[in-house]
Amino acid sequence: MNFEDIEDQDGIRLSWNTFSATPAENARAVIPIAAMYTPLHENERMTIEQYDPVACRAPCRAVLNPYCHVDLRARFWICPFCFQRNPLPAQYSDISSNSLPLELLSQSTTMEYVLSKPVKSPPVFLFVMDTAVDESELTALKDAVIVSLSLLPPDAIVGLITYGSLIQVHEIGFEAMPKSYVFQPAADYSTMKLQQLLALSGNQIRSSSSKAKISGTGITLNLGAASRFLMPVQKCEMHLLNILEQLQPDCLEVPAGQRQLRCTGAAVKIASDLLGIAFPKCGSRIELFCGGPCTVGLGQVVSTELKEPMRSHSEIANDKAKHFKKSKKFYSSLAERLSNQGHALDLFAGCLDQVGIMEMENLVNNTGGAIVLSDSFTTSIFKQSFQRLFSVDASGYLKMGFMANLEVLTSKGLTICGMIGNGVGENKKGTNISDTQIGISKTNSWKMAAISPKSSYALYFDLGKEMGNPNSQRPTQAFIQFLTYYQHSSGTYRLRVTTISRSFITGNAKSISESFDQEAAAAIVARMALFKCQTEDEMSVTRWIDRNLIRLCQHFADYRKEDPSSFRLLPNFTLYPQFIFHLRRSPFLHIFNNSPDETSFYRHMLNVADVNDSLIMIQPTLQSYSFNEPEGVPVLLDSVSIKPDVILLLDTYFHILIFHGSTIAQWRNAGYQEQPEYVNLKELLLAPRLEVTELLADRFPIPRFIVCDQGGSQARFLLSRINPSVSFNKSSQFSPMSKDSETVLTDDVNLQKFMDHLRKMAVIS
């Protein structure tokens, strides 16, 4: 079974591809039955049908798929999830065994339908810009927003709010002159009060005759009085550009020893209320730009006094962060409101200091938004990442969905434990809910205000109660159907349906072990670990990971009791301990050198990544370029790979680093590459940069690009991620220590010691 081929077709990978049929066997497997699913996975072979799907009767509502039994003579089909008989619709009256509809063909395990249900409005983008920054930062930010306007569909609705010491809601529908409503950060305006102040209450909201057409649908939307603040970009672009060009940095003078007054929390609340008034339950995104931490009003992260430092991990853990709990509670309640309204928030940080991402993370994580962490709005990381958010597909539509809902159906014998990913559970309970809770649980349906082809979700399953009854007839086949409803940027509602089937097996440990996908399992366990970090400290989570690894090896490895030298793992298990070793050392769990904002950013990214991207984050890739291998070859993520005469290319997903060995760096500094007789050195120096261009092609957000030399300060990014097999004069398991090997000064256990201890613990009686 080729797991990657299945992923290419259906966007799904499972930890186990054959399921134990009894609860006892399933418990011994340690790692739960789980799927890494990317609903909007890009598949060129998938067809998009322009009709509503054929669905089973309520309450099942499963969609017709290749695993359904069809009786062509009696004209009915049997649902594999509930076994109900359903009549075939009239339009299928001419089908035969040689002429089946597309959804019944074996290759149609993933289908997409364009639904007849009309959309309520085109997508809405509300820009919330920080003006409490210096002039160069604001100029770069304005330029980025101006460029983004040209990337939006003409019918997209836009609005503008700026904030610093005060909040300004700009009237983009008043072309005679720039006009805005100013709000104080200290006041907590209710939604009703905001309606009154913006003249949007009562009949006023419909008093305007301003309308907007939704392209491609023939539907006209009455914007009402809200059109003063939110208008189609094609109607207000020139006036909005004029407003942006006239924006100035916050004019309030900052006394020495103090921070800028910045009311981020109050600005986001007003943005949320404005969208809730004008576009409730409509696909919308708030684009929030932060040039520093919130220092005043709702959601305050730190005081204006510079002598008060930003909170650290230890202060948060010891409950010494003065503003953290109150701020976190405020943003979490705001996140719940945004999610209920169907609105997402994207957070762009452009500051060397922290801006409060850890406090605000639920605004993004609960709504399916994105986080971009950069040092400045002038950097290419911010500019290119922001533009990439608005990338389009081959048809010219934005690669983003709105108002998404993911529902999971299972056949008899399988139940749902929960989901770990960016979204929230819906108050909807099917008959297939497990008593075991993992992640966002007690439901089989989750909603995401925003979704993209990069959005992946980990879904966890358990055996049904009937599988534990030896007297009941156990099913031999399990079926899972994923139903993803979402608003497409073309102005249509769509349904993506993926249906998979796997076998139940009793007593055949070999078949179960051979079905193990160690890469998917590593990503699935990593998400479980991050979810546990919300309520437990990192050390406890690390111990939990270690215990599970030992139990897994005890059950699936070959060994003689009390004999570590006899320990052997099957080929499809051999890399899993290595993944766990690097996960333990990764910035997701090893947070000592990270700020709280960085930790939140890293964990957010892992919670949206698919299997391949997750593995790069957990265990970075390392390529070596030398005169013997000028095109580059993968090498061990180990200190023995660091040599004076090679160039290394490290990809951690968040950083891409080109590392020059000491000899290569000396030759480069001497300028040998500029001499004709050393053209091979010039080509060698260029080779990793060409590879970097390919790595950056579709990466979001853009990673930090670092070029460094052996012995330089920036080399720490490489040394912190490699296996320290050569440390304190200890030799490596891969090769004897040589004078060329890099010695890593660390107390961390290396992979060899980790594996030795694992073998020892696994073979204990």
Curated annotation (Swiss-Prot):
Subcellular location: Cytoplasm; Cytoplasmic vesicle, COPII-coated vesicle membrane; Endoplasmic reticulum membrane; Golgi apparatus membrane
Modified residues (Phosphoserine): S565, S566
Keyword annotations: Cytoplasm, Cytoplasmic vesicle, Endoplasmic reticulum, ER-Golgi transport, Golgi apparatus, Membrane, Metal-binding, Phosphoprotein, Protein transport, Transport, Zinc
The keyword Metal-binding is assigned to this record: yes
Gene3D superfamilies the record matches: beta-sandwich domain of Sec23/24, Sec23/Sec24 helical domain, Severin, von Willebrand factor, type A domain, Zn-finger domain of Sec23/24
Principal location class: cytoplasm
InterPro entries reported for this sequence: ADF-H/Gelsolin-like_dom_sf, Gelsolin-like_dom, Gelsolin-like_dom_sf, Sec23, Sec23/24_helical_dom, Sec23/24_helical_dom_sf, Sec23/24_trunk_dom, Sec23_24_beta_S
Source species, domain of life: Eukaryota
Swiss-Prot/TrEMBL GO biological process terms: COPII-coated vesicle cargo loading; ERAD pathway; intracellular protein transport
One Gene Ontology term of the molecular function aspect: GTPase activator activity
Keyword RNA-binding (UniProt): no
Residues that bind Zn(2+): C56, C60, C79, C82
CDD domains, A to Z: Sec23-like, Sec23_C
Any one GO cellular component localisation term in the record: Golgi membrane
Membrane topology, from the record: Peripheral membrane protein
The family this protein is said to belong to: Belongs to the SEC23/SEC24 family. SEC23 subfamily.
Free-text function comment from the UniProt entry: Component of the coat protein complex II (COPII) which promotes the formation of transport vesicles from the endoplasmic reticulum (ER). The coat has two main functions, the physical deformation of the endoplasmic reticulum membrane into vesicles and the selection of cargo molecules.
Subunit structure: The COPII coat is composed of at least 5 proteins: the sec23/24 complex, the sec13/31 complex, and the protein sar1.
PANTHER family xref list: PROTEIN TRANSPORT PROTEIN SEC23
Protein name: Protein transport protein sec23-2
Origin organism lineage: Eukaryota, Fungi, Dikarya, Ascomycota, Taphrinomycotina
